[in-house]
């Protein structure tokens, strides 16, 4: 028996947002999408999806699409660490904008499988944060900023092959890259021009 008009109009059944429906369909193709600022909530979702896909098949590739202005360092590094932790190759594909932590995650994909679409913009800069409070508080926060900066420089150097000193100089202020410039710098391995270049789950 087909549903009645009243059943269509029921409000006691929560409707799944269209974005969530799309995300679930992408997940079935082993595609994870980061399309916003990185915070704890989105990081926990992406970490969970990476772990789930790895548990389902420890050999097939996972593809992470990135369109993000950056965000929380701790949240972003949770994603980063899981990308390195799971045995699967993680393809990264930059679309639109990969800035700050988005840039870090883009270059952290498996070597040879890091991509960007032609008009993607990539931005690198040093970590920043507000400092205030007592002298002791300021000293503690300053030490943490120095630690994060050193970690970022070392990680970016590892993934790009650029010397730490060069990255430190380039990241002193916002440094913008086109997709081609990002390729030359070592953030990515290829600029994609059509969809057959990268697929969802094949290794």
Swiss-Prot record:
GO terms for cellular component: cytoplasm; endopeptidase Clp complex. Transmembrane segments: none annotated. One of its GO terms (molecular function) is serine-type endopeptidase activity. It is an enzyme of class 3 (hydrolase). The keyword Transferase does not apply. It catalyses: Hydrolysis of proteins to small peptides in the presence of ATP and magnesium. alpha-casein is the usual test substrate. In the absence of ATP, only oligopeptides shorter than five residues are hydrolyzed (such as succinyl-Leu-Tyr-|-NHMec, and Leu-Tyr-Leu-|-Tyr-Trp, in which cleavage of the -Tyr-|-Leu- and -Tyr-|-Trp bonds also occurs). Its main location: cytoplasm. The active site is at residues 100, 125. Its EC number is 3.4.21.92. It is found in: Cytoplasm. It comes from the Bacteria. Belongs to the peptidase S14 family. Cleaves peptides in various proteins in a process that requires ATP hydrolysis. Has a chymotrypsin-like activity. Plays a major role in the degradation of misfolded proteins. Fourteen ClpP subunits assemble into 2 heptameric rings which stack back to back to give a disk-like structure with a central cavity, resembling the structure of eukaryotic proteasomes. PANTHER family: ATP-DEPENDENT CLP PROTEASE PROTEOLYTIC SUBUNIT. This is ATP-dependent Clp protease proteolytic subunit 2. The lineage of its organism: Bacteria, Bacillati, Actinomycetota, Actinomycetes, Streptosporangiales.
């Amino acid at each position: 028996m087909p549903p009645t008009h009243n059943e269509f109009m029921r409000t006691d059944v929560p409707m799944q947002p269209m974005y969530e429906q799309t995300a679930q369909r992408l997940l079935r193709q082993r595609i994870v999408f980061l399309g916003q600022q990185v915070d704890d909530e989105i990081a926990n979702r992406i970490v969970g999806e990476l772990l789930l896909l790895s548990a389902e098949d420890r050999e097939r590739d996972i593809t992470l699409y990135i369109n993000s202005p950056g965000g929380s360092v701790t949240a972003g590094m949770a994603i980063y660490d899981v990308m390195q932790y799971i045995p699967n190759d993680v393809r990264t594909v930059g679309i639109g904008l990969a800035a700050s932590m988005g840039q870090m995650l883009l270059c952290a994909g498996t070597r040879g499988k890091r991509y960007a679409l032609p008009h993607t913009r990539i931005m690198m800069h040093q970590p920043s944060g507000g400092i205030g409070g007592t002298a002791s508080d300021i000293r503690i926060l300053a030490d943490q900023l120095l630690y994060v900066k050193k970690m970022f420089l070392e990680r970016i150097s590892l993934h790009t092959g650029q010397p730490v000193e060069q990255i430190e100089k380039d990241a002193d202020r916002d440094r913008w890259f086109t997709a081609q410039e990002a390729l030359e710098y070592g953030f990515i391995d290829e600029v994609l021009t059509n969809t057959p270049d990268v697929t969802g789950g094949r290794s």
